[in-house]
From Swiss-Prot:
This is Chaperone protein ClpB1. GO terms for biological process: cellular response to hypoxia; positive regulation of translation; protein unfolding; response to heat. Disruption phenotype: No visible phenotype under normal growth conditions, but germinating seeds have greatly reduced basal thermotolerance and are unable to acquire thermotolerance. Faster degradation of HSA32 (at protein level). Induction: By heat stress and oilseed rape mosaic virus. Regulated by HSA32 that retards its decay in a positive feedback loop (at protein level) during recovery after heat treatment. It comes from Arabidopsis thaliana (Mouse-ear cress). Residues 3-147 form the Clp R domain. Residues 164-410 are annotated as: I. The keyword Transmembrane helix does not apply.
Amino acid sequence: MNPEKFTHKTNETIATAHELAVNAGHAQFTPLHLAGALISDPTGIFPQAISSAGGENAAQSAERVINQALKKLPSQSPPPDDIPASSSLIKVIRRAQAAQKSRGDTHLAVDQLIMGLLEDSQIRDLLNEVGVATARVKSEVEKLRGKEGKKVESASGDTNFQALKTYGRDLVEQAGKLDPVIGRDEEIRRVVRILSRRTKNNPVLIGEPGVGKTAVVEGLAQRIVKGDVPNSLTDVRLISLDMGALVAGAKYRGEFEERLKSVLKEVEDAEGKVILFIDEIHLVLGAGKTEGSMDAANLFKPMLARGQLRCIGATTLEEYRKYVEKDAAFERRFQQVYVAEPSVPDTISILRGLKEKYEGHHGVRIQDRALINAAQLSARYITGRHLPDKAIDLVDEACANVRVQLDSQPEEIDNLERKRMQLEIELHALEREKDKASKARLIEVRKELDDLRDKLQPLTMKYRKEKERIDEIRRLKQKREELMFSLQEAERRYDLARAADLRYGAIQEVESAIAQLEGTSSEENVMLTENVGPEHIAEVVSRWTGIPVTRLGQNEKERLIGLADRLHKRVVGQNQAVNAVSEAILRSRAGLGRPQQPTGSFLFLGPTGVGKTELAKALAEQLFDDENLLVRIDMSEYMEQHSVSRLIGAPPGYVGHEEGGQLTEAVRRRPYCVILFDEVEKAHVAVFNTLLQVLDDGRLTDGQGRTVDFRNSVIIMTSNLGAEHLLAGLTGKVTMEVARDCVMREVRKHFRPELLNRLDEIVVFDPLSHDQLRKVARLQMKDVAVRLAERGVALAVTDAALDYILAESYDPVYGARPIRRWMEKKVVTELSKMVVREEIDENSTVYIDAGAGDLVYRVESGGLVDASTGKKSDVLIHIANGPKRSDAAQAVKKMRIEEIEDDDNEEMIED
């Protein structure tokens, strides 16, 4: 025996068989070991040939019988160092070598080894024992070589028998298991026309990811099964080639090319009865390319041009441009078929066609309104992906959510079960106690437990009954799907008796059983819901995008209606601005906003420190419960023309192209946001040109060519233009109307008309009056009080102290900001000194009053928490009447617990 004259597969088989003999401690290496090694490989030729000859379970039976025979062989312990081959094994190999020479093979292939093995009397008897005739196994093995009898001319030659079966799957065979294809008739007809050509009969499907390119080929497979194709395509096999399987495990140089050649040879031998489908056809270009070898595309080209190979390719537009168009010789052999994204109505039709498949898989019922919602919401809110893929994913995930809820216990039962467990633990603990109180409690617990069990039992029974009904419906739907597949198979084989039995017998029985079970659920079903409705789809959209599209709950309705009032708690005055913003949010959440524009776009004008930026922060806090979720762009950083690229990302060829823009990336990740362009007048005019498209159509294309959706964002721009006119109006030099007109004149002079014309509203913020500034001072003092509250310290402040702070810090030109600066410098600094000097203890109160030319600070024990009642006071205690220093301590004591309201009924912040 010369191993060099054996194929790699033969050598591997003999080595495995030898290892089997060594591990078992057998004295000889026999044909039985060889049979054991061959049958243990599930993808090998031997088990496949036995299954074809004797039925589906024949290979498993043969493996069992061979293993039993191996166990009966005598074994030695320890095993011998060298195990000789038995005379019967040598005869097997000699017979195989004789057959090899007669066939003209250069290497001994596995199929010849099997043919030699089948001549062995012991193996023949074992196969007869399981009812498999060796003659039939031989004929199945011979079929592997094909009609012309392929020759094995290399060490890897026998790996390519049945190459199409090994490296592909027949879509026509699996047509019944594929999802139904709705629409796409024009594309399928175009593919059929190209396939019917004499030469260059190779269509390539190109389109965006997720538009249904592979579905077109699956639709063709289903038409071939039904016979709805021209004569040239009847009875053809549509094989989907797995390029990964072709490349995987090709260890030796030339092995990949040999595999591919064998696939192409099988296609050629089929004489037009095989059409190859290569998904992601760009992978063919460069596949298997190493130094000194050619890639797969060059092996395809000659056959593609001559029309010997009919091939359907599929790839995305980007990859087609990137890979296929570069190889003009490869590209010209394919005819392009563009697969466009379906419209929303077409997507709804596709979803209706798939509805039954998803209902059967998940065991739920999908409402038609949910399908319409999925198509509409995905088209509107999920950008960067394409229909119908994103709509199908929405339906699938919504069904999965409902299914998960069905498989878990209802909340009502779960709560009662937990309570029952707690009472049982308490019962066991009390049973050991001897005192009267425990015995009395024991009687109570037993009674509670009995009541709970009485309540729980009917609920559990109802839940189990409903669960069983839903599970049975799911099982029947899956059975119906399997029967429909069997029906298609029977019709394809023209087994009319079987088809009639299925259509008018089994399938009708299953459908009537499903209808009966679904009919019983018409009563009010409080325990479990198996329906997937529009609200489930909306919930998934909200989870994916962060955009609240779910139906408005009662709490949220109240929040939206009271949005303006809550914004006023943080922003003093500025009614026009607050109302404009809150109304825009209300329109958006009610679903009546303009669909193709941002939720709202505003230009806030006014002097510094009047609350323009504060309103944007307050809005972000109300919408997202966190003011930091504001997308803030400081326009003072965009004073040069080239800085526009920082907003939308650098163009190709520039450093930072891969990073994306500061604005576009932030909005792409969180489409539902508040965008603040602060100090907008300081930016270069080129920046405004970029924003025109955002304000008009709610979209912007970034540096990488991706379209970013701004339709769910609120855009706020702030500017100080014309602030001096408003200050003149405040001091009485001119009327406020004249001042506003002057401001608008300045704005029109600075900004282009096309920008101003696209804004929803231009809001002029009025300078803050003295009373409004006092409210601001109180809000700032609350901020200090919140910081102190972390130490358990309450803060009390008199009106006199607030008036003193205002008198010291008020500057009409700078608005409210000087108040914060003065407070930080004076009040916070003094409090910090008192903390460091340990004058302020935990759970004490600091009260601030106006003294002679300065603020006076007093500390008293008893702070946020009252020791006697355990109640918390407000973090900021406001002393409205402004008691003098001598009376202040008593006033603080009285007001520590109760809530104090100012003259404007403004609520204090609670800890």
